């Protein structure tokens, strides 16, 4: 337990930041999983492109705000772009 008033405040701030960081990373994980799910489900190209756009926007935002490292955001965007460019829905 913190002994000083300022240490108590820092503990509260750290808890809030931790929760915020966890929520943002969880959102990112969901967006990335959504795109992968659409690719695996052989969805229409337009649906995959919409998911790609949402994922890139989320990666850009989190990279700029330093929730994730900017290089990681760039690497993930490159991987998503490659997956989108290689994606061709097969008729079933």
Curated annotation (Swiss-Prot):
Residue intervals passing through the bilayer: none
Keyword check for Protein transport: no
Gene Ontology biological process terms, A to Z: translation
A Pfam family the protein falls into: Ribosomal_S20p
Keyword line: Ribonucleoprotein, Ribosomal protein, RNA-binding, rRNA-binding
Region (Disordered): 1-26, 73-92
GO molecular function, one term: structural constituent of ribosome
Biased composition (Basic and acidic residues): 1-21
Cellular component annotations (GO), alphabetically ordered: cytosol; small ribosomal subunit
InterPro entries in the cross-refs: Ribosomal_bS20, Ribosomal_bS20_sf
Polar residues: compositionally biased ranges: 82-92
Keyword Ribosomal protein: yes
Matches recorded under HAMAP family: Ribosomal_bS20 (MF_00500)
Function (record text): Binds directly to 16S ribosomal RNA.
Family: Belongs to the bacterial ribosomal protein bS20 family.
Protein name, entry field: Small ribosomal subunit protein bS20
Organism for this UniProt entry: Chlorobaculum tepidum (strain ATCC 49652 / DSM 12025 / NBRC 103806 / TLS) (Chlorobium tepidum)
């Amino acid at each position: 337990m913190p002994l000083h008033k300022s240490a108590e405040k820092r503990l509260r701030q750290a808890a809030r930041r931790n929760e915020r960081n966890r929520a943002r990373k969880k959102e990112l994980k969901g967006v990335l999983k959504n795109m992968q799910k659409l690719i695996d489900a052989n969805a229409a190209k337009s649906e995959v492109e919409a998911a790609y756009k949402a994922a890139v926007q989320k990666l850009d935002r989190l990279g700029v705000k330093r929730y994730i490292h900017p290089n990681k955001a760039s690497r993930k965007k490159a991987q998503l772009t490659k997956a989108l460019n290689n994606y061709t829905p097969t008729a079933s």
